[in-house]
Amino acid sequence: MKFNKHLQNIKTYEAGKPIELVVREYGIEPQDIVKLASNENPLGCSPKVIDAVGKILTKMSLYPDDSMISLKNALSKRYNVDSENVIIGSGSDQVIEFLIHAKAHSGSKILMNSITFAMYEIYSKHVGADVIRTSSQEHDLDEFYELYKQEKPEIIFICTPNNPTGDALDAQKIYNFLEKIDNDTLVVVDAAYMEYAIVKDAKKEINVKELIQKHSNVIYLGTFSKAYGLGGMRVGYGISEAKIIKELYKLRPPFNITTLSLEAATVALSDEEFVQKSTALNLEQMKRYEEFAKEQKIDIINSYTNFVTLSLGSNQNSTKIASQLLQNGMIVRDLSSYNMNAIRVTIGTQEQNSRFFKLVIKFL
């Protein structure tokens, strides 16, 4: 049987191992496993969300409100934009998929950082586009601009804060870069971890309203999977000029967000106290990782997210260490697939982080 020829060059995306799989593979009891691999909120989600979702369980037999008007209005209010500027996806990665299918085709060029979110490349290959990468690990917008002039890409991806490294750009640098890009090149600003970044450094915050008013070729992406603690609900969004959103809607399948997910995201957005609690805990515990890395003489990338990336020495192997941790009930992310001898560790609770420190020392 023949399949789309572009699939031959695509590797399946491997998400962080779920706890259930570790239970089956290693026979470790669930309560003895700590998952610090997928950048989930260690506090879970807002109690208000749990209460609200519980009250609508009887509606599961009904299709959701496909207009998603309550959530769109809530996001519009949060960012001070019109609802016509908002599209909701099953995770922000679905919006990324829409964008690439809407703008790129076989032979198109798509520009991204050398190390960044893997789904940009995977979706690019869906349509047979050519991926152009920078040479630097961190987002060097001067290099981005030089490659933009040389390659004339259809789409540019800027991931800030970046996954899986955690570094972030000052908003002003992004604004300056956008001034030099023509209106026919789509620029995607993926800000999945922005709630964490702005707590650490206010200079990272992007004024979304001004962004889309000044630039008709830009879309801003956000998600409920991280600071809001709704990774299992799969809700993300894009904010852009109404004309772009209208085109993306042509690719959106009906009822792509469930009734429970819509309710959860809408309520989560209203509970600012929970997000503040989550980001405060994250910043507090991040300092412990920075101190630990200094004590152990491990290179740590300055992170503006809810994870840290620990770069290992030449006498260490990230795959081996991640495997040793896994066998002891500690799930972290090996970054060897990004050509990095490093592990990415989600910042957990105080207890979870203490357990990681105590365990990883044995294998360093």
Curated annotation (Swiss-Prot):
Nucleotide-binding is among the record's keywords: no
Sample GO molecular function, one term: histidinol-phosphate transaminase activity
Domain of life: Bacteria
Modification N6-(pyridoxal phosphate)lysine, positions: 226
Needed cofactors: pyridoxal 5'-phosphate
Pathway: Amino-acid biosynthesis; L-histidine biosynthesis; L-histidine from 5-phospho-alpha-D-ribose 1-diphosphate: step 7/9
Record GO biological process: L-histidine biosynthetic process
EC number(s) per entry: 2.6.1.9
Enzyme class: transferase
Keywords from the UniProt entry: Amino-acid biosynthesis, Aminotransferase, Histidine biosynthesis, Pyridoxal phosphate, Transferase
The keyword Transferase appears for this protein: yes
Catalysed reaction, written as an equation: L-histidinol phosphate + 2-oxoglutarate = 3-(imidazol-4-yl)-2-oxopropyl phosphate + L-glutamate
Family label: Belongs to the class-II pyridoxal-phosphate-dependent aminotransferase family. Histidinol-phosphate aminotransferase subfamily.
Assembly and interaction partners: Homodimer.
This protein's name: Histidinol-phosphate aminotransferase
Native source species: Sulfurimonas denitrificans (strain ATCC 33889 / DSM 1251)
